[in-house]
Amino acid sequence: MREIVLDTETTGMDSAQDRVIELGMVVFEFDPASGTVVRVVDVFDELEDPGFAIPPATIAIHHITDDMVSGRQIDDAAVAHILKDVAVVIAHNAAFDRPLVEQRWPVFADMDWACSFKDIPWREEGFGPAKLEFLLHANGFFHEAHRAEADCRALLELLSRHLPERQQPALLPLLETLNQPQYRIYATGSPFETKDMLKARGYRWSAEIRCWSRMVAGEEARAEELTWLKRRVYAGRPAHVEVEP
């Protein structure tokens, strides 16, 4: 089977306002029974002009300048082609990357997604922060690239490593979450003052429907999220939560 590891570099951290300026993808084959990565099949990396100046603070992180992206556009047909025969898109913090790429390339909305940040029990396996650079360092890698293709390759290497407690590749628990039902939770009518709390929880703002939402996997996660919303966001107010399978 084939999956794809995806990473983006963007103009900023607001998925409602910012734009993708670099899209990186690594397609790989794996054994679904063991979670073993077999081989890399294809690699994609292209830059795109966002149509406005990249903020200096963002350039300082990924070192992609206005001159590097000037006049460039990512090939939509090439993106669609590389997704052919791919079962799942994996991103480290998919809650950020997914809305950005779905907005730019609607083909991603029809794909199944997995998040290596939240769908792998890193803390239970003895790791601290689940940020990619920390996980890589804990596994003996020193990676400071902050470029899309390099981050994809680094994540794939991390997914191929065995978790210390399970003694299985990190890819395997990620695959297990895909067998659970996926739900999009909408925090309809959430109070304005809770926006930072929602964003920190992994919710993303949709300017089109003017609502915060996030994806969760499984009935347990769904129930937990609804309880959290009612207690922390609505806090005794009438709750306006919508769930979409």
Predicted regions and their residues:
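Active-site catalytic microenvironments for nucleophilic, acid-base chemistry
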Residues: 104, 138, 158-165
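Residue-level "edge-of-site" marker
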Residues: 72, 149, 211
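Short Asp/Glu-rich motifs
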Residues: 78, 155, 217
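Acidic two-metal-ion nuclease catalytic site recognized across multiple nuclease folds
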Residues: 161-245
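Short secondary-structure capping/turn micro-motifs that flank functional sites
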Residues: 75, 152-153, 214
